[in-house]
Amino acid sequence: MTTKLSSFCFLTHGLAGISCEREHGSSRRFFYLPSRRLVSTSCKMRQQRGFDSSKRQEVKKGSPKPILSINSGLQSNNDEESDLENGSADSVPSLKSDAEKGSSIHGSIDMNHADENLEKKDDIQTTEVTRRKSKTAKKKGESIHATIDIGHDDGKNLDNITVPEVAKALSLNKSEGEQISDGQFGELMTMIRSAEKNILRLDEARATALDDLNKILSDKEALQGEINVLEMKLSETDERIKTAAQEKAHVELLEEQLEKLRHEMISPIESDGYVLALSKELETLKLENLSLRNDIEMLKSELDSVKDTGERVVVLEKECSGLESSVKDLESKLSVSQEDVSQLSTLKIECTDLWAKVETLQLLLDRATKQAEQAVIVLQQNQDLRNKVDKIEESLKEANVYKESSEKIQQYNELMQHKVTLLEERLEKSDAEIFSYVQLYQESIKEFQETLESLKEESKKKSRDEPVDDMPWDYWSRLLLTVDGWLLEKKIASNDADLLRDMVWKKDRRIHDTYIDVKDKNERDAISAFLKLVSSPTSSGLYVVHIAAEMAPVAKVGGLGDVVAGLGKALQRKGHLVEIILPKYDCMQYDRVRDLRALDTVVESYFDGKLYKNKIWIGTVEGLPVHFIEPQHPSKFFWRGQFYGEQDDFRRFSYFSRAALELLLQSGKKPDIIHCHDWQTAFVAPLYWDLYAPKGLDSARICFTCHNFEYQGTASASELGSCGLDVNQLNRPDRMQDHSSGDRVNPVKGAIIFSNIVTTVSPTYAQEVRTAEGGKGLHSTLNFHSKKFIGILNGIDTDSWNPATDPFLKAQFNAKDLQGKEENKHALRKQLGLSSAESRRPLVGCITRLVPQKGVHLIRHAIYRTLELGGQFVLLGSSPVPHIQREFEGIEQQFKSHDHVRLLLKYDEALSHTIYAASDLFIIPSIFEPCGLTQMIAMRYGSIPIARKTGGLNDSVFDIDDDTIPTQFQNGFTFQTADEQGFNYALERAFNHYKKDEEKWMRLVEKVMSIDFSWGSSATQYEELYTRSVSRARAVPNRT
């Protein structure tokens, strides 16, 4: 807004204004200052742009000091003196100023506000007034230059400038010899009155401008509130704020310069050149203010992009779930391969012994064969001798005929007789030798047969004497599934199935021997043999059925699959009967299921007012018996190519939950515990108590575990009726109604209310979800049912994650022999091209998904801070969030050939094992972590964790510098606040401990490697919960 004033500004000869103190000073006074000339007056008022928002708070501490200056020039030629003392004494009104509104004339007011929306300006353009030269005025004249500087007035009026004062000033000139005529004096008085009118108009224009400024200031206050809100969201712009702080210092310097200029303005200004320099300085300030405004616009645009980030995170995190699935699949494959290797090693030893015995027997057989061949040769020689003897006998008979004929014939006969005697003796010797060889051969054959018989007896005896407890769980699960299959196919009675199942449960030798005996017989004979074993023993264990959407390694997306498999195996080892019921997905790992087959029966379940058939498959996974349900529904619920992420997930899993309970009912099973997991099977709890307990499936207590309260599966209340539940009864605030809307239901809330036991994956997370922030709307429900709600820390598969047997490592090691850890560290440095010049340089590892939940801003900061502290840093992981992935790709390029930093933006199973084994320190700076596994794996491999105190991290990592924690539990370094300062404190302490005392550090490594993070302790806690709940149920027969 610009207001032009077409008026004259008059200043008396030698009149100058002096500004007083800043904001709370006294009223201003005018003084007479000598001057020699009158010059043209320029009046200008402009509202300047504000400073940058980062400087706003500093500016508010002190009120601005606006300057209103009027340069008036009055050019006159005086020919004669005049007596002013008798002139009229009309008063000239004083000029008023309001420093708080920020007006200025021939100056500038810096409002010190940085709101880009404030575009209004008040500009009182320059008005130059020059008095016409009097025709009679002399050419000699002096110019009087005066400057009135009106400062802060605090609402008070300035002293008036009156005509007598002007006359008095003019009389001073008269005393110096100048002459003013009466005509000139009258003309001068006319000009003074005209100036009074113009000054009044100037006051009115100023008042109008001040009103506009009031409106602008009110707009500023509203915008200031919005800016305060935006400032709280600028956590990612800390570096820009620091830059703004530097600019603030620059502005303060400029303010000091302005203050000096203000004081200099108090003194008379002797030359127009000084005013020109001052104007240029003001123009420079304006340009700087424009630059600051552009910075604010840039910050605001970046803030808008930050707001969109949160909305994309949830969608993009789902894309990472596939990576986690492949990781867990590889882990399970490794576990199976290790079990196979251990079994092969035993078989190899037995095979070696048998080969040694066979080789001994082969030698004996070869020796006996040679002896037999020699005996055969002797027999052939004997046969030749016998033929010769026969011929001789024939000759003798002929000779007897001619016996009497000749003496020669008689002598010949005597000679022949002697030869025969010799031949007979030789024959006897040959017979003796042949007999000895044959006897020796028979003895060898007998010894060989005895050896074979002894080996057979030893093998049979070993098979009979082998303890039944040493049989693998796959064997017992297969036997259990066989019994269940006969029951579902109605080939045995329900009571007989219960008794046989109980014998399997107890690993009864009789059922084992029977199974071995009938293994090759037909099914009818096998069933008859099994039914002969039926008895009524009592069982000491629990019968637990898990109904879940995932199970590692066959159908795994996240930690849920690990819990179902790990907890199931741990409970099985404790002597409990454990079964799993899963959907039969088309995309699951079928090669990880042993003895998978379909039963010759179907189970019908209700959905959408109809009965649908379900095909039942059985098999063993990791030694656990598993039932797979394949719905014969036209929607092909689990034939979609993925586990989750379908539009009808609510319908898919509510159908599966009812079909699972129908399977238990129709098979006649009587479990003690039905354990359901996450929202996908949360429907089991209300279905069990509302529909199936009245039908006779009433032996079980319901346990529900929520692995992440971020996912609650809410849907329209009308969809709940598809599985047969009463919508009117359950869509209530005290049942399943979601807190967000009255027409939506929450399966997780229903499971919490209808379950007998409710658990989550760590004690700290159990406390966090009972708050409004962590509970995601369920905190009040959890607090109401707090007596049955508990957090149990998950475990890890210590067979797969074992540095003593890990095949991915360059060298295996354990807590008693850490030499292998140094070898793995050297191997990793060589593999990644890192410097090995200093073997004691600490190596910091990080394996994670690069998502906001994992604290990516702290991970990024850790890279640079590790270098500053003299360490090396290795990162393995990728991000489903595009801008995060791009950011870390840029950092990767920055350190591509660096000696101490390497970023690997992918997931590599083998490399992850090596990083765990090689790292000295391992960072987990998560913002939010229900349980977490990496800290446990890191400690298992001798890497000391640096973790934020949240969720499961707070339950597994305890600071070694915290004296309130017993020494035996201290195992890492922790920090509370999710900022760089908190993280730096923990990282620096870790480096100091590492470098200060090597021997003490090695003892710490040995200690953390010895900590038991297996499923054993967790399974014991679940076992206690199960037992207490079942005991209470049996004590109260009519439970609800």
From Swiss-Prot:
Subunit: Interacts with PTST2. Interacts with PII1; the interaction is essential for the initiation of starch granules biosynthesis in leaf chloroplasts.
Chain segments annotated as coiled-coil in the UniProt record: 187-466
Disrupted gene: phenotype observed: Severely reduced growth, reduced number of starch granules and altered structure of starch granules. Significant loss of starch at the end of the day in the center of 4-week old rosettes. Changes in starch turnover pattern with a reduction of both starch synthesis and degradation rates. Loss of starch granules in over 50% of chloroplast sections. Larger chloroplast starch granules than wild-type.
Compositional bias of kind Basic and acidic residues: 52-61, 112-124
Chain positions recorded as ADP binding sites: K556, G559, D562, R849, K854, K906, D908, Y916, L933, T934
GO biological process: starch biosynthetic process; starch metabolic process
Family from the record: Belongs to the glycosyltransferase 1 family. Bacterial/plant glycogen synthase subfamily.
Principal place of residence: plastid
Keyword Plastid recorded: yes
Miscellaneous remark of the record: Plants over-expressing SS4 have increased levels of starch in leaves and display a higher growth rate than wild-type.
This protein's pathway: Glycan biosynthesis; starch biosynthesis
Keyword hit for Disulfide bond: no
Transmembrane feature ranges: none
GO molecular function: alpha-1,4-glucan glucosyltransferase (ADP-glucose donor) activity; alpha-1,4-glucan glucosyltransferase (UDP-glucose donor) activity
Catalytic activity: [(1->4)-alpha-D-glucosyl](n) + ADP-alpha-D-glucose = [(1->4)-alpha-D-glucosyl](n+1) + ADP + H(+)
Protein name in UniProt: Probable starch synthase 4, chloroplastic/amyloplastic
Function summary: Probably involved in the priming of starch granule formation. May play a regulatory role in the control of starch accumulation in plastids. Is necessary and sufficient to establish the correct number of starch granules observed in chloroplasts.
Tissue distribution of the protein: Expressed in leaves and flowers.
Record's GO cellular component terms: amyloplast; chloroplast; chloroplast stroma
Keyword field: Amyloplast, Chloroplast, Coiled coil, Glycosyltransferase, Plastid, Starch biosynthesis, Transferase, Transit peptide
Region Disordered, residue ranges: 43-142
Transit peptide: 1-42
Pfam families recorded: Glyco_trans_1_4, Glyco_transf_5
Annotated compartments: Plastid, Chloroplast; Plastid, Amyloplast; Plastid, Chloroplast stroma
